């Protein structure tokens, strides 16, 4: 459980307790965090349940003045996981002078987001500015993770060029699944972003920031699409190669079986109780 209160006026500065217009960052919330958010700040109970759903799609919701925004951000599991690279929901909850982010996983993206904003030393103009900066950060991290995926694909291909191994084929299959999750989540975030332009109060600075986010998401989507096509083609190539190898082996085994069958066939013929002309 990590609950941090950030003063966002002049850069990000950690403070001891909640105050109006601060950013409440909650990571891996436990029961005490849930009580604080629901009882002290008064957020709707189902908001946290929606954020905790790992399959929750990117969306915007509004309930009695409360705004819930869920975007999907990249997340790295264990390397041997079924999908080493996947996406998880990040929830942003706002109302008046209250701004909260909730994530049920500890991510490099959020750590980097805080570090980068502190380095900028500018903070956020308002909650809407922070929302779009989180979108921008997620797009940048999608591109970072995609580069890592491409590096793993290249490594597996080099290994397969030397020797076709099941472990490398399984690794490529897992990365194929990861790319599917990335493409789906990026498209969902883009759709959500287009809605937020009309749902939130967007000023001129926000409009420029949204344009930057659109560019980054478009690049991430196109990159993920290219890697997906390359990986699909690679998997098809190795599948054909394996099929050809199996066909060659089967032909050889068939030839050996036919050759080995002749002695048995001759013995069977001469062992029959038939007159063959050689008995006289």
Map each language-model feature to its residues:
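Peripheral, non-transmembrane regulatory/ligand-interaction domains of membrane transport proteins
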Residues: 1-204, 209-212, 216-219, 223
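Hydrophobic alpha-helical transmembrane segments and their immediately adjacent juxtamembrane loops
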Residues: 42, 218-280
């Amino acid at each position: 459980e990590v609950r941090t209160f950030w003063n966002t006026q002049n850069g990000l500065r950690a403070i001891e307790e909640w105050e109006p217009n601060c950013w409440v960052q909650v990571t891996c919330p436990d029961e005490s965090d849930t009580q604080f958010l629901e009882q002290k700040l008064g957020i709707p109970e189902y908001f946290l349940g929606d954020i905790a759903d790992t399959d929750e799609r990117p969306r915007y919701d509004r309930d009695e003045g409360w705004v819930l925004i869920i975007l999907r951000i990249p997340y790295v599991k264990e390397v041997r996981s079924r999908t080493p690279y996947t996406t998880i929901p990040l929830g942003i909850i706002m109302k008046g002078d209250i701004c909260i982010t909730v994530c049920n996983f500890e991510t490099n993206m959020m750590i980097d987001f805080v570090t980068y904003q502190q380095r900028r030393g500018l903070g956020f103009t308002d909650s809407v500015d922070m929302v779009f900066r989180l979108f921008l950060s997620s797009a940048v991290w999608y591109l970072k993770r995609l580069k890592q995926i491409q590096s793993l694909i290249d490594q597996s291909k080099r290994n397969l060029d030397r020797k076709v191994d099941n472990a490398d084929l399984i690794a490529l299959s897992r990365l194929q699944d990861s790319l599917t999750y990335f493409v789906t989540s990026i498209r969902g975030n883009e759709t959500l972003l287009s809605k937020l332009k009309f749902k939130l109060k967007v000023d001129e600075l926000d409009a420029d920031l949204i344009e930057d986010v659109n560019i980054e998401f478009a690049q991430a989507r196109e990159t993920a699409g290219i890697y997906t096509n390359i990986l699909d083609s690679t998997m098809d190539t190795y599948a054909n190669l394996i099929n050809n190898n199996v066909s060659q082996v089967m032909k050889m085994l068939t030839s050996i079986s036919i050759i080995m069958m002749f002695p048995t066939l001759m013995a069977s013929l001469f062992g029959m109780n038939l007159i063959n002309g050689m008995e006289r």
